[in-house]
């Protein structure tokens, strides 16, 4: 019997973020969305890779997404999915592939993104932690289930 491993990459974005274990400065926040999403998807059978924090820069985000797509079967990008001046996720996904949905009638989680790059699903999670968890649960878990996980 062949057993296939599904690899999910998780990319946190945001210039205000610091890694867990660090003390954020004024206006900063500890990055937690990828840890929570990795735990959720890992329980479903995925092998998750959490990448380093990507600052709010479309060039850096593009490089991170290209790497994530090469190394994984599915990619989740945390934050940058809204319509602010530092939210580049949808534009970068569109430049590398296609955005299928941007904005879902789901609360919390409205600004979530569903896209595809090189035939692989890409999900843009909102930055707000409970919205990110909701989007991961409602969008990524069903994809894993459809793949048999």
Please give the residue ranges for each predicted region:
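Phosphate-binding glycine-rich loops and their immediate beta-loop-alpha structural context
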Residues: 1-77
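Short glycine-rich anion-binding loops that position phosphate/pyrophosphate groups of nucleotides
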Residues: 15-16, 80-85, 127-130
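Short glycine-/acidic-enriched loop or helix-start segments at secondary-structure transitions
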Residues: 20, 86-88, 134-135
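Short, solvent-exposed amphipathic alpha-helical segments in soluble enzyme
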Residues: 24-29, 66-67, 91-94, 138-142
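Structural signal for hydrophobic packing residues in well-ordered secondary-structure cores
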Residues: 45, 65, 69-72, 93, ...
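Catalytic-core segments of thiol-dependent peptidases
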Residues: 73-83, 97
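Short Gly/Thr/Asp-enriched flexible loops that form oxyanion-binding sites at enzyme active sites
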Residues: 84-96
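Flexible glycine/proline-rich
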Residues: 94-149
């Amino acid at each position: 019997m062949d057993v296939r491993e599904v690899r999910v990459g998780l990319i946190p974005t945001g210039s205000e973020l610091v890694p867990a274990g660090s003390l954020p400065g004024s206006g900063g926040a500890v990055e937690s969305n990828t840890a929570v999403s990795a735990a959720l998807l890992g329980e479903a059978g995925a092998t998750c890779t959490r990448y380093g924090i990507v600052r709010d820069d479309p060039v850096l985000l593009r490089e991170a997404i290209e790497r994530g797509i090469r190394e994984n079967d599915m990619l989740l990008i945390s934050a940058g999915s809204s319509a602010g001046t530092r939210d580049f996720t949808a534009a970068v996904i569109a430049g590398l592939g296609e955005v299928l949905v941007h904005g879902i009638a789901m609360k919390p989680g409205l600004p979530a993104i569903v896209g595809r790059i090189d035939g692989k699903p890409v999900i843009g999670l909102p930055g707000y932690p409970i919205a990110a968890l909701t989007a991961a649960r409602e969008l990524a878990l069903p994809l894993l289930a459809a793949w048999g996980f």
